[in-house]
Amino acid sequence: MDMKDFGTITSSLELSKMFEYENPFDFKKPTVQMLGRWQPWHDGHTKLFEKALTLTGQVVIMVREVYGIEGDAGAGRTVAQTDNPFGEIAVIDGIKKGLGDAGYEEGREYMIMAVPNIVDISYGRGVGYTFTEHDLGKDVHEISATKIRAKMREEGKL
């Protein structure tokens, strides 16, 4: 799809059709953004999604393109996130499976968007949105993608 195609869009329904969603995702409705590596998607991410969904009723999950990245932590980061064994398609498939198993439908409650390796979000004052960190409790915070990847390696699945 060429970017010029977006110039003729007159409604979120038309935009939803371009993304092949059967149930229109309302592009004008307030929406929560979740940005991450999701290496891999796990139950803690699903709990975060469910919390985010309560805020507006729809969520855009942004998948950072980080497959195979080594080295530099990036702008303003103190710790490099270099263990990125899953490519974009595998990550997106994992998100769809995890949320599908929990009863959520892409295009209704959420959409997935691949984005560059975003390492900083800059904004000015009065921009009309907030940054929210959700405390999901000790049990959820103990779920660790690092531990999941280590176990997958031990079992020869990665």
Predicted regions and their residues:
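Nucleotidyltransferase catalytic core that binds NTPs
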Residues: 2-158
